[in-house]
């Protein structure tokens, strides 16, 4: 059992016998009213999203999910096929099921992901916190005011755009932090 104040992004709770992923949780306490937790939830089975406000002392059932290592096998349209690295079982997910990691999923990637199962059904995939990707396009370096941290836009092979350091060039391998939508960490070693 969890209380409302213990909810955080990534927590999975059970509502009406379905697993719901907490995507966002914001704790608020005012002088007059009791503390509340505003949450954005996603049903892991249907993909339905909703917002619910919980009292800090509301009791909620948490869900234990099974996790296995998997790699991306291939992409066919909006269907992504992942393979279990231990028994080579293939699992399919739609693009909407993995929308939070979709900007960093690309054909031929070798990252070992964490496949998340509920009642032996694959419901989502989580990438490692740091991944390495190749810069497909970026502008040239800016000359002049470089006293601070100078960033410029770059595009990855799958079309994802993010800001990178000014010295990064086309073809460079960069490290990306996949939490919170992804951000540039540095040049890959």
From Swiss-Prot:
SMART domains: EFP, Elong-fact-P_C
SUPFAM superfamilies in the cross-refs: Nucleic acid-binding proteins, Translation proteins SH3-like domain
InterPro entries, per database record: Elong-fact-P_C (IPR015365), NA-bd_OB-fold (IPR012340), Rib_uL2_dom2 (IPR014722), Transl_elong_fac_P/YeiP (IPR020599), Transl_elong_KOW-like (IPR013185), Transl_elong_P/YeiP_cen (IPR001059), Transl_elongation_fac_P (IPR011768), Translation_prot_SH3-like_sf (IPR008991)
Stored CDD domains: S1_EF-P_repeat_1
Family: Belongs to the elongation factor P family.
Compartment(s): Cytoplasm
Protein name, per record: Elongation factor P
A Pfam family the protein falls into: EFP
GO MF assignments: translation elongation factor activity
BP term (GO), one: peptide biosynthetic process
Gene from which the chain derives: efp
Record Gene3D superfamilies: 2.30.30.30, Nucleic acid-binding proteins
Lineage, top ranks: Bacteria, Pseudomonadati, Pseudomonadota, Gammaproteobacteria, Pseudomonadales
NCBIfam families in alphabetical order: PRK00529.1
HAMAP family: EF_P (MF_00141)
Reported function: Involved in peptide bond synthesis. Stimulates efficient translation and peptide-bond synthesis on native or reconstituted 70S ribosomes in vitro. Probably functions indirectly by altering the affinity of the ribosome for aminoacyl-tRNA, thus increasing their reactivity as acceptors for peptidyl transferase.
